[in-house]
Amino acid sequence: MKKDYYEILGLTKSASKDEIKKAYRTLAKTYHPDVNKETNAEEKFKEITEAYEILNDDVKREQYNQFGHAAFDPNAGGFGGQNPFTNAEGFSGFSDFSGFGSIFTDFFGGFGNSQRANPNRAQRGEDRHAVIKISFIDSVLGKEIVEPLEKFETCNTCNGSGAKSQSDIITCTQCSGMGEQIKITKTFLGQMQQNVICSKCNGIGKEIVEKCLICKGKTHTKTTKNITIKIPAGIQNGQTLRVENYGNAGLNGGSNGNLILSIKVSPHKHFVRKNNDIILRLPVSIKSVIGSEKVEVPTPYGFEIIKIDPNIKTGDELIIKNKGIITKYESGKMIVIFEIFIPKLTSFEKKEISTILEKNADKFYEKWIKEFE
């Protein structure tokens, strides 16, 4: 015959929940198998835990006070754990018809014997996302950035259990460690039994009496570390980089998620990227054109010196190889588009130029205009 639960904890029926919890903690620390090496310590610890799980739950305590141990004995009749789909002749409802299994599992979430994913399995944490802004030049040349990043690590105090001590981890008092509860749903077919995740333990089957003082039951702590992020040369706007293990914390010993960084490249005032080429509109004075002068062409890698062809006009292009986007697969080019401009002149300078030009007939224009006659 089982011993009275109140007697096991050394309490009376009028004991408050605080008194029940205090009595359990005291006895659990005394008889925990990791601490007490006596032969009957483990059995005594299980007995104490069972008593606490019943008396700490208001519904179960009320049932125990009214019916005693018979309230939780499936063979005692009354309100035991009988399957509502089983009748006196042994008919087991829809479970005999395999064709209905998947249909009703999808529709109602599964019957009492349906399997569910193990909530205690290791689960990888979710990825976190952030945007990092870089300059156009940094996107071409690449760069290393040192950033302080938050990282979740297993709590060293509780070793990831979330509890103040091992004795604070008990079987869930609501689902008795099953991780599930039976829910009865009324449908057009009648009452249907459905297994749902326990709302108290979220399907884990365990609950914590007193949480870890450091992580507050979260099983992990948050630290900040300076991490070097390598921006590869040639990266494009919208591309992503991955920083492993800097995402959200995993569950049940699962690995952290990753930090996904989306690259946002700030536009340059003069350089424009087209695939792996860089386009530059270069203003050139008419003086430099006439005199076929040398001018500097800016590139992301420094300045290039070119000699102006005296025959160029606005819109003409010059290709400079290997001065575009350079990746391990391809070396882009710089495309220079000339824009000829006339500098500001004084009245005297304009008169001198007019005198010079009057001596030279504009044969190109004369030929062009005759095409319309």
Swiss-Prot record:
A zinc finger (CR-type) spans 142-224. Zn(2+) 1 binds at C155, C158, C212, C215. GO terms for cellular component: cytoplasm. One of its GO terms (molecular function) is zinc ion binding. The J domain is necessary and sufficient to stimulate DnaK ATPase activity. Zinc center 1 plays an important role in the autonomous, DnaK-independent chaperone activity of DnaJ. Zinc center 2 is essential for interaction with DnaK and for DnaJ activity. PANTHER family: CHAPERONE PROTEIN DNAJ (PTHR43096:SF48), DNAJ HOMOLOG 1, MITOCHONDRIAL-RELATED (PTHR43096). Participates actively in the response to hyperosmotic and heat shock by preventing the aggregation of stress-denatured proteins and by disaggregating proteins, also in an autonomous, DnaK-independent fashion. Unfolded proteins bind initially to DnaJ; upon interaction with the DnaJ-bound protein, DnaK hydrolyzes its bound ATP, resulting in the formation of a stable complex. GrpE releases ADP from DnaK; ATP binding to DnaK triggers the release of the substrate protein, thus completing the reaction cycle. This is Chaperone protein DnaJ. It comes from Mycoplasma mobile (strain ATCC 43663 / 163K / NCTC 11711). The lineage of its organism: Bacteria, Bacillati, Mycoplasmatota, Mycoplasmoidales, Metamycoplasmataceae.
